Amino acid sequence: MADSSFSPFAMAQKQFDDAADILGLDVPARELLRYPLREYSIAIPVTMDDGSVRVFRGFRVQHNDARGPCKGGIRFHPQETLDTVRALAMWMTWKCAVVDIPLGGGKGGVVCDPHNLTQREQEQICRGWVRQLARNIGPWMDVPAPDVMTSSQHMLWMLDEFETITGERQPGFITGKPVGMGGSLGRTEATGYGAVFALREALKELGIRPSDTVASFQGFGNVAQHAIHMYRQLGGTVTTVSCWDQQDEQSYSYHRKDGIDLDQLLGISDRFGGIDKSKARDLGYEVLPGEE
């Protein structure tokens, strides 16, 4: 079982405290940066396809906007917490600052499981999230994006709702849109490729050739799939990937000593990156149970 006492936000604060000590940061700056500037907890009532009404909990955390509008994704996950969203918003502040992008850190989420929701129900959650937060987000304040179990389709629903509320065209409200609606080419691959490009530069510094490395990947969604593709292009070998099994409600690792076949695994995975373990065994993968 996972350790329920673990706090991502406490870990993020500890990381900040260590860095602040090294930098000799003054006390007022520390007190400001250790906590979010603003955070919102919302309730989203949705009429389900069967006629019942469910209320979904949602969040948006704006950690810091000193360098520009807050920026960060929206996560749909059944175990989403405000604590996790706080940590991710803080990390977004540091990531934008480190690469000198004039944006601050934000993050959002909804406690829900898209596996068990119809397209219409997911659309209503997206639109409800925007309606609740429309006065506190936008191109000059806070720009959302896709994240865990959200896609360009979710962003399009949110954009449409925001434009309906404001009564004007607002393409800068959200990123990760379909290319035909103002999205960016390469957005789908960017996060996974970026992770591997960072790894490539680190290996250069260490004098290690990618072809001499072996890796395991946690997750098999959009980010991991593109990261695995690029890592293998560089010559690296991936022996193991792990992902969540929705039916068993636990994670499994899929291992093959001589390296996985990415196209093969893509052929037996669902749209969320969940791998069919029976088919994986038939293809010669060792299936190892992980955390529930």
Please annotate each region the language model reported.
Residues 15, 84, 194:
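Charged catalytic carboxylate motif
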Residues 16, 20-27, 89-96, 126-141, ...:
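Structural signal for hydrophobic packing residues in well-ordered secondary-structure cores
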Residues 32, 43-45, 98-101, 146-147, ...:
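A generic local secondary-structure boundary/capping motif
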Residues 36-37, 46-48, 62-65, 107-110, ...:
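Glycine-rich beta-alpha junction loops
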Residues 42-114:
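Glycine-rich, N-terminal phosphate-binding loop and its surrounding beta-alpha-beta segment
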Residues 77, 97-211:
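Glycine/serine-rich phosphate-binding loop and adjoining beta1-alpha1 elements at the start
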Residues 183-292:
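Glycine-rich phosphate/diphosphate-binding loop of Rossmann-like nucleotide-binding domains
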